[in-house]
Amino acid sequence: MPKYVEGIELTQEGMHAIFERMGHPNITSGTIYNGEPTIDKGALDRQGFMPVLTGVSPRQDSGHWIMLIKGQGNQYFLFDPLGESSGKYYQNILAKKLPGATLSVIPNNAGLNMGLCGYWVASVGLRAHAALTQPIPPSLRNLGQTITQEMRDELTQDGSEKITQWLRAVGNEFPDGDIQPDATALRRATEKNVRIDEFQPVLTGTSPKEISINPTAPQEVSVPTWNGFSLYTDETVRNAARYAYDNYLGKPYTGTVEATPVNFGGQMVYRQHHGLAHTLRTMAYAEIIVEEARKAKLRGESLKTFADGRTLADVTPEELRKIMIAQAFFVTGRDDEESSKNYEKYHEQSRDAFLKYVEENKSTLIPDVFKDEKDVKFYADVIEDKDHKWADSPAHVLVNQGHMVDLVRVKQPPESYLEYYFSQLQPWIGSTATEAVFATQRQFFHATYEAVAGFDSENKEPHLVVDGLGRYVIGQDGNPIREESDDEDEEESGELKFFSQKKKLEENQRYMRVDEYLKLDEVQKRFPGAGKKLDGGLPGLKEYQYLQRLNSINRARCENDVDFCLGQLQTAHHQTKITPIKRAFQSSSEKARRQPNMDEIAAARIVQQIMANPDCIHDDHVFLNGQKLEEKFFRDLLAKCDMAIVGSLLNDTDIRNIDTLMQHERNTEFHSTDAKAKPVKLGETWEKTIRSGGGVTQIKHDLIFLMQNDAWYHTRVNAIAQNRDKDSTFKEVLITALMTPLTNKSLMDTSRSPAPKTLFRGLDLSEEFKNKLINQAETIIANTTEHLFTDLSTEAFKQIKLNDFSQVSARTCASTSTNIEVPRTIFGSNTIFEILDPDGLLHPKQVGTHVSGSESEYSIYLPEDVALVPIKVSFDGKTGKGKDRHIFTLVAVKSPDFTPRHESGYAVGPLLKMQTPKLEEIQRLVEQAREEPDLERVFNLQSRVARQAKFSTESGYKTFLNEKVAPVLEQSLNGLLDNNVTILGKVLSAFPSDGQWSAFNSVEARQMKIQMDAIKQMVEKKAVLEGQILPALAQCQNALEKQNIAGALQALRNIPSEKEMQTMLSISGGLRGQIQRAKQDLTETLEPLQRAITAKLVSDQEKVKVRYEKLIAGIPQQIADLEKAELADLAKVKKVVSRFNHLQEELKLLRNEKIRMHTGSEKVDFSDIAQLEAQLQKIHTKLYDAYLVELTKEISALVKEKPKNLADVKRMVSNFYAMSADIEQLRQEKIKEHGESKDPIDMSDIDKLKEELQKINQFLVKAMGTNIRVSLNQMEVKTFDAQEKEAQQNLKQLDALINKLESSDAVQKQKEELEKLNQLLVEKRKAYPAMVQLQFRSEALIIHLRELCEAHQAQMAKTRNVRAQEITNGRWKVQWLTDWVGLTTDERVTLANKEKELAKFKEDLNNDEYDLQELISNLAEKNPSELEEAIGISKESAQKLHKLLTHLNHSTTFMSKIEQRLQSIDELLNEFGKQAPRTEMIKTVEEKQGTLLRL
């Protein structure tokens, strides 16, 4: 409950807090208690004003606020928000505390209080004080008018509702900020900074929708959610441990046995065996044992019960707290280690230490921890352990078992003790849980630097029978000696015979060894340690290192420092929750995000191209480079890509392009997932509201701001990203796919803060969905437990995979905070994820400090190979709206097992297809550049060369032409004639170089060179374009069509480089540039794809294989159990259906695992799974038929029910919804049964059930509407808040019921009725301030009646005394005789009886035990004459009072009646003010006495 506001009124603490917030710290307020004022006049004079709370009583902490104001000199003023007439009733009361002073009432008008008197005192009251302390104060009349007008002004335009909402919003804390002069200014300055929950009538068709997640956790068993209590965080328990240490455990022993102190690392330890560390470990075991018992119950195991039917799984947090306090003192009474002789004495002393602690801390322990002295005595008896009742109660078991679990460290042989203690704990919590306790025990020993013993089931030492410290014996025949069996027909042997260690063995007898004992059948059945071995010490440490550790300073700190020791245990305890989870999965040592795969690289490239060219965006698709990308493509990107990885591939140019994109999408509408919210124009809002100027860094901050703060945007984006959206437009899906990676990039670029290890995420979920999450979490937690001998990792793997908890936070930028109060208080979330990231796997990014107060805000995009696994669920009280709040503690774990196996190519395929137009365009240009060779020119040149060679006189030139030029021309001609580009390519290198030509300077030689260069360019152009570029382009295109990235890149490498093509003058510079740009663009697109890494799904092949074999091995037995399952009623049928569906999910998991293990190219063999699926399918028909029969019975029974009240109706509604869900489940089962058949599905049987349920629905709508109307008319002031919340819930439930109706006419009619009920609730809310005002006026009436009664009866007492004395003086001596015979009457008896009667009336009227309504009810039972006589009012006034009391005795919410009653109170109080105390009754007595005397 809020501490500052009760209903809509400020409490005393709230009044002090609001004045402190306004700059008036430590004010003193006054009270009027039962009509008696408590006023500190000195404080009033110092402060200048004093709020006074009236109507206070032992039964009521709040009341009506008024204000005393110190004026000039000895002048005081009274301000009453109810008005002048109400203030005058308090004037006389308060004047008694201001002797000699003048107290005036400010004449403000009535009817404006609206139940907000505390607020008015802190607002207009303070302003009145300021006015009255001016050098020239206003007249009271003017001040009254000013106050009246100010109150009227503030109440206009639903002012009362606004004030009420603000008061409720600040009910726990007033927002920080500048000092304000009064409450009005404070409200207006802080309204925008507080979360105001506006009243919303229930609109038809707006019932909450849940997220479509179907957990597979069985719904059969549950335990109450833990409230978060823990040894490590509870100060009460910690203080008890400190007290025990300071006064006992930290003191030297006074005895002699093993009492010598030990020096560990320079610190003395006085009690190394039964000291602080031992005590704290036993307390930690208690917590572990209860945790594991709860897990065992959730697993469906049967546990040993106590006399009251409870088990250790039913221990409450409050009970465990008391048990731990008792454990803190369990060994405090020891004088030394001689416990066997002094057990009774030591435990008596421990009990006395406990009792002494409780007595010294009684004020904080009783009744807050222990209910009473009887409760304390019970725990004292547990400590004393007088009768060794170790199984009587949870306290007995936990205290004694905790002690025993810790004893293993000092007992030999350890195998014997471990087996015995295991057998003692096992019945209470089961074998699996017992293993977990002893596994945790070893971790606790490590954590507190205690020695950890080994366990060897092959130990040849004699076995010790712990219970009695005896032995078992192997007889002469080599078999164990046993007791004779009592049952002659029993085939099994008797129990092992116990022998004292003092008994002398006979010849050929010997003690049974440890290994022999552990191999016995009866031991192996109950103890899983047979054939197992556990190493002692600490893994990784050599013996001498381990001994150093055991004698270190930290060992001493664990014995001497409560906080240090608890910290060590807490760390170990926490690790035992995480280790089983990690053990169940393939390990991953890499903490960083994985490298991008091909599709993520392709996605980034596509995002970049769209951002750079927003004109490619159309209303229902994107048309990019010839490819039409529709909604499914972008949904695939969101569902299959890690968008944080995609974001890491983007650059600042892409960020800058956001402004361009937003301009293009200026009028694109974005819709919040809230159906009532108006759509927002994306680009326009970005430009006008979000963007605040600045460069690329500011764009990043603005994008983050948009994602974090604008619900119209982030609710839709998150819903689309997680594929749980409805009615999204293509543009909204596209924007989500573009902005999600860009937001991640912005977060990565702007975050500079170190990554926190703990984050909190708040969600507001429907109760139904939250309960499913709780069920999922508890199923996972129950199956992830530490083990000592038995490997449970396969079951843990299965439950975590089947109940994936990560999807709630996956695929989107999830907002989190390092401060739990952000989701808890600021946002009022009913679900909080406490996310632990000890290994730094989540890479949270600080949102940025662009908004003040956002420094604690972080965003996480969950890596796809990281899962959030629950390790704890805690109840965390109520939200501001009265909902239960739960905290889910999750740990981040990384493994290839969490990486989904997507079919690749969903993004690469479209990207590669986009490259085809580029290739085709280059091919077109190259084709255009091709020319037919000029063969005639070659012929002519050949002839010319032949002539010059023949007639040349220079022998060198002649030789050059014949050997270098002529062959090249011949080869070129052949190549051109045959169109053989290969020959032409080779010929190119044979053309004479410029150096060779330079040796000949003749005119003929120079002309010949020019001609040869022209031929060379002709050959070169054909050889390069047709022999290299066109084939390379064709090869590249062919490779891209086959998604052969390497082949495409190799083809691109076959295109000459830019440097090579610079010398190819035969090809135009423009074409060369186009070719090189296309090559570069294609290479830049394809090379990153070639470097992409495919995530490795299997890092430990053997582990995955063994896990699969274990999973599939358990399925046949589960199927056999289903075949034999009992189907006697609906509950049992549903239980079996749930198990059936769960088994189907297990088979799906097995299919996924088989795919994960598959590495070859051949088809996966699913034959083993298919065989199991076929077996399962045979069971389904029988299940469906049984489900239909039992559901029909239940619906028929519901039709016949006749509810008597709203509770009955709501119970029927609950059954109605359950049956609606059953019908839907039945429909799904029918679809499953139909399978892949092409025949139409016959749903007639289900349709009949739906018709019957519709009749129930119609009846419930009418019944609920009627009952809601009645309850609304019966709302009362004291319970208004609770009744209002209940009414809102009922109206929501009615709305949901109406929406279930199938007839449109019926729906419309009932929605009209719902609207009327909504309006009626609004009217009651409006009437509430008047109801509060009526209560205050009723209190004033009672106070005035008390004053009248007091004055009247005081006057009557005087008159009676005088009259009684007169009668006594006037009696003669023997008148007693005439009285006795009846001739006269002694009227003193009558006077005395009347005095008693009136005194009883006065006592009841002033009884503090009654609340206001009880007082009114008692007075209403009196008749008018009794009221007249007892209070001293006129007959007419008594009749009016009786009538008024009769009305007030019945509460009302109707304004007309409230106003009528307020008017009657005012009229009566005015009449009372004019009447003087009456003494008619005394006069009547006098006359009667006189008459009797005359007789």
Curated annotation (Swiss-Prot):
Residues 476-497 are annotated as: Disordered. Pfam families: SidE_DUB (PF19049), SidE_mART (PF19048), SidE_PDE (PF12252). It catalyses: L-arginyl-[protein] + NAD(+) = N(omega)-(ADP-D-ribosyl)-L-arginyl-[protein] + nicotinamide + H(+). The modification 5-glutamyl glutamate is found at E855. The keyword Transferase applies. Its EC number is 3.4.22.-, 2.3.2.-, 2.4.2.31. Residues 1-192 are annotated as: Deubiquitinase. The active site is at H64 (for deubiquitinase activity), D80 (for deubiquitinase activity), C117 (nucleophile). Disruption phenotype: Cells lacking all four members of the SidE family (SdeA, SdeB, SdeC and SidE) show no intracellular growth defect in mouse bone marrow macrophages (BMM), but display attenuated growth inside the protozoan hosts A.castellanii and D.discoideum. This mutant no longer recruits the endoplasmic reticulum (ER) marker GFP-HDEL to its vacuoles, even at 10 hours post infection, and is unable to induce RAB33B ubiquitination during infection. Residues 755-995 are annotated as: Mono-ADP-ribosyltransferase. NAD(+) binds at R761, G762, L763, D764, L765, S766, E767, E857. Residues 484-493 have a biased composition (Acidic residues). GO terms for molecular function: cysteine-type peptidase activity; NAD+-protein-arginine ADP-ribosyltransferase activity; nucleotide binding; nucleotidyltransferase activity. GO terms for biological process: protein deubiquitination; proteolysis. Keywords: Glycosyltransferase, Hydrolase, Isopeptide bond, Multifunctional enzyme, NAD, Nucleotide-binding, Nucleotidyltransferase, Protease, Thiol protease, Transferase, Ubl conjugation pathway, Virulence. Glutamylated by SidJ; glutamylation inhibits sidE activity to catalyze the production of ADP-ribosylated ubiquitin. Belongs to the SidE family. Effector that interferes with the host cell ubiquitin pathway and is required for intracellular bacterial replication. Catalyzes the ubiquitination of several host Rab small GTPases associated with the endoplasmic reticulum during L.pneumophila infection, without engaging the standard cellular enzyme cascade (E1 and E2). Transfers an ADP-ribose moiety from NAD to the 'Arg-42' residue of ubiquitin in a reaction that releases nicotinamide. The modified ubiquitin is subsequently transferred to serine residues of the substrate protein via a phosphoribose linker that results in the release of AMP. Homodimer. This is Ubiquitinating enzyme SidE. It comes from Legionella pneumophila subsp. pneumophila (strain Philadelphia 1 / ATCC 33152 / DSM 7513). The lineage of its organism: Bacteria, Pseudomonadati, Pseudomonadota, Gammaproteobacteria, Legionellales.
